[in-house]
């Protein structure tokens, strides 16, 4: 998931079908983050796809976790693209919708299906029992729900048992956040992904954030949260503030169905 699925351009978005099959045949792809480290002399942060969706599904199975793939909704990174040339028109979305449907088939389909056979040929004839799929990452504005809607309709029609996750955008409050939550309710997504990269004070003051959330609407997926002081370093203070926030997540488990610390798998120097 994350901004990787968007790509700096629509051509460099994460395409899951390039990440399955024989490892030696998988293409490389430029990473959304390849230029965001000023100390690096070269834009050398590429994706080899040696670790793809099949391997992620295997990892989830091995550690007893539920896989939650995030797919592109037809929008490249909106921070990087204010115009429309790197966004897919709504009437051209069918290949992207097919990618979502095919991924569910790859994860859960019988070995007699096209993508179930690919999974079986890779050594896993049994279903991965995928339960969740997220469409879009930190998208915002009307561009997002108008693209999300046909995905929701198609997935509901073919795989009604799959829980669909929409996004509340990159902010934890404000104009875009307030716009997207009613849209997610209108589209009847199952969960809404909220992201928080905020100060220690914010985390301490937000322990009761979900006490007053609507219990009749979509559930919450706190998909990215991390306490960021000025220097963004981890410390006892940041851990304490995150723990305070987590008491609110646990207390409101009837509405906060899922949560994930970011980064759940830490990296070192962009590797």
Q: PLM ranges: what are they?
A:
Residues 1-162, 166-180, 186-187, 204:
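N-terminal catalytic cores of secreted or lumenal carbohydrate-active enzymes
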Residues 58-59, 153-156, 160-163, 181-186, ...:
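Catalytic-core region of carbohydrate-active enzymes that cleave or remodel glycosidic bonds
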């Amino acid at each position: 998931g994350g901004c990787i699925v968007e790509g700096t351009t629509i051509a460099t978005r994460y395409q899951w079908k390039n990440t399955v099959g024989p490892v030696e045949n998988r293409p490389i792809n430029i990473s959304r983050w390849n230029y965001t480290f000023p100390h690096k002399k070269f834009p050398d942060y590429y994706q080899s796809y040696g670790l793809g969706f099949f391997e992620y599904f295997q990892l989830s199975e091995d550690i007893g976790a539920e896989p939650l793939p995030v797919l592109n909704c037809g929008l490249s990174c909106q921070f990087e693209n204010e115009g429309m040339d790197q966004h897919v028109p709504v009437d051209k979305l069918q290949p992207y919708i097919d990618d979502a449907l095919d991924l569910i088939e790859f994860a859960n389909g019988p070995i007699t299906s096209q993508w179930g056979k690919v999974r079986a040929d890779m050594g896993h004839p049994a279903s991965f029992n995928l339960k969740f799929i997220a469409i879009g990452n930190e998208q915002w504005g009307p561009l997002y729900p108008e693209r999300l809607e046909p995905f929701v309709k198609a997935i509901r029609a073919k795989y009604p048992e799959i829980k669909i996750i929409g996004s509340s955008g990159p902010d934890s409050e404000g104009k875009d956040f307030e716009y997207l939550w009613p849209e997610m309710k209108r589209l009847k997504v199952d969960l809404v992904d909220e992201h928080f990269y905020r100060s220690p004070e914010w985390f301490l003051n937000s322990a009761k954030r979900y006490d007053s959330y609507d219990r009749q609407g979509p559930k919450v997926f706190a998909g990215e949260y991390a306490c960021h002081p000025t220097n963004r370093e981890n410390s006892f203070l940041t851990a304490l503030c995150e723990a305070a926030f987590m008491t609110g997540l646990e207390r409101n488990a009837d509405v906060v169905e899922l949560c994930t610390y970011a980064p759940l798998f830490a990296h070192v120097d962009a590797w």
